[in-house]
């Protein structure tokens, strides 16, 4: 099978609504782009928990502390789930989980820039949760039908849990 035929077969699978798995043949650009996108998503989930975790000890009530701790735990878990499936996809590129994380420290991997903003007040924490999680629900729900099967499956869980954060 020529490269053009493999690409045509790959695109036909996507057009039929089939899901692509990590072990399936895929064009190099599809793999590289997906790794970069999922890496950014994973790191955004993890980095998004950092400003909010600072508020756990200062939350105004025990109920708010518990709620915020659960949210931080969810966000860290989302990041770990997405990073795990990114690891499988990146393996044929010779990248390990350690390499993916190292990319964050070298600036090769990014995360949403909203997480660079400080949250000096409890109100900031609430607004961040409302706006950022609201946007996450909308943007991630749009990706539920992703052609990459592992990502689509993880997003089902992530989207269900993000809905509780608003």
Where are the regions a protein language model picked out?
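Extreme N-terminal leader/anchor segments
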Residues: 1-18, 23-24, 62
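Conserved alpha-helical segments that form or flank metal/cofactor-binding pockets of metalloenzymes
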Residues: 1-10, 71-103
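Metal- and O2-centered redox machinery and metal/ROS homeostasis
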Residues: 12-20, 28, 52-58, 69, ...
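Acidic/His metal-coordination segments adjacent to aromatic residues that form catalytic metal sites
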Residues: 19-39, 101-129, 146
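Helix-loop segments that flank and shape redox-cofactor active sites
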Residues: 25-30, 47-70, 136-152
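Alpha-helical scaffold segments that form or flank carboxylate-/histidine-based iron centers
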Residues: 30-41, 59-78, 125, 150-164
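Long, contiguous alpha-helical bundle segments
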Residues: 42-45, 130
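Internal, conserved structured core segments that host functional sites
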Residues: 111-164
């Amino acid at each position: 099978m020529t490269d053009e035929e493999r690409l045509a077969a790959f695109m036909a699978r996507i057009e039929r609504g089939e899901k692509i798995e990590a072990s399936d043949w895929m064009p190099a650009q599809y793999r590289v782009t997906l790794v970069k996108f999922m890496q950014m998503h994973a790191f955004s989930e993890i980095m998004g928990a950092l400003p909010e975790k600072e508020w756990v000890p200062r939350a105004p009530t025990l109920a708010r502390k518990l709620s915020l701790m659960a949210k931080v735990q969810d966000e860290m878990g989302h990041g770990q789930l997405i990073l795990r499936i990114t690891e499988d996809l990146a393996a044929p590129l010779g990248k390990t989980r350690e390499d993916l994380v190292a990319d964050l420290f070298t600036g090769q991997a990014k995360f949403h820039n909203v997480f660079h903003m400080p949250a000096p007040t409890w109100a900031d924490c609430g607004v961040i949760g409302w706006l950022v999680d609201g946007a996450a629900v909308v943007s991630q729900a749009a990706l539920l039908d992703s052609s990459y099967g592992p990502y689509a499956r993880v997003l089902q869980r992530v989207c269900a849990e993000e809905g509780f954060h608003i």
